[in-house]
Amino acid sequence: MNPNLNIEQDNASEIVAGVDEAGRGPLAGPVVAAAVVVNQSIMIDDIKDSKVLSKSKRESCYDKITNSYYYSIGIASVQEIDKYNILEATKLACIRAVKNLAIIPTKVLVDGNMNFTDNRFISIVRGDQICYSISSASIVAKVTRDRIMQILHKEYPVYGWNQNCGYGTKLHIDAIKTYGQTIHHRVSFKFKGNINHSAILGNMV
């Protein structure tokens, strides 16, 4: 199923923003949310949930989205993830993304089933698969976070973040066991195996 504008068109009197996040599951790096307000007169081909698009297709769609629509980014840091938990940090990133928009939305469609105190926010399960605005936001969030992890990889190359984007691949987990964790790792995240939690690394080359 390709995402469509049915929900947006059902709310034609509203300024509708779609919101999605990237990076809830990784062992390292921030969680990133994007908010997108689409211009319904400009439809971009290939807009789908970012997870089903190739990297090159995501990059191409990202350029078109950011050149055609209002969009913004919200980030919750590793420190906030460890302090509040990943769910609350994700909600924080989503709220920040909406606040950072240059236009104020009157309705906010969010992928998933999170609850927000702001009554503008409406959660839609599998929204990234059915809602064009949310799908657009999923692409912007994913590409933005991947680029952040590319930058962090240059600082700590042994973890392979240029390939795994902080997710728990064998290479990444083995590197944590060998070298310990960095300031960019989520110490609140647990997985099988022994980790040296006290080894906070400086720059590695």
From Swiss-Prot:
Keywords, ordered alphabetically: Cytoplasm, Endonuclease, Hydrolase, Manganese, Metal-binding, Nuclease
BP terms from Gene Ontology: DNA replication, removal of RNA primer; mismatch repair
InterPro entries for the chain: RNase_HII, RNase_HII/HIII, RNase_HII/HIII_dom, RNaseH-like_sf, RNaseH_sf
Enzyme class: hydrolase
GO terms for MF: manganese ion binding; RNA binding; RNA-DNA hybrid ribonuclease activity
Ligand binding (a divalent metal cation): D20, E21, D111
Pfam families: RNase_HII
Cofactor binding annotation: Manganese or magnesium. Binds 1 divalent metal ion per monomer in the absence of substrate. May bind a second metal ion after substrate binding.
GO cellular component: cytoplasm; ribonuclease H2 complex
Gene3D superfamilies, A to Z: Ribonuclease H-like superfamily/Ribonuclease H
Localization (cell): Cytoplasm
Enzyme Commission code(s) on record: 3.1.26.4
Cofactor(s), names only, from the UniProt record: Mn(2+); Mg(2+)
Ranges for domain RNase H type-2: 14-201
Function: Endonuclease that specifically degrades the RNA of RNA-DNA hybrids.
Family from the record: Belongs to the RNase HII family.
HAMAP family in alphabetical order: RNase_HII_B
Protein name: Ribonuclease HII
Organism (species): Orientia tsutsugamushi (strain Boryong) (Rickettsia tsutsugamushi)
Gene: rnhB
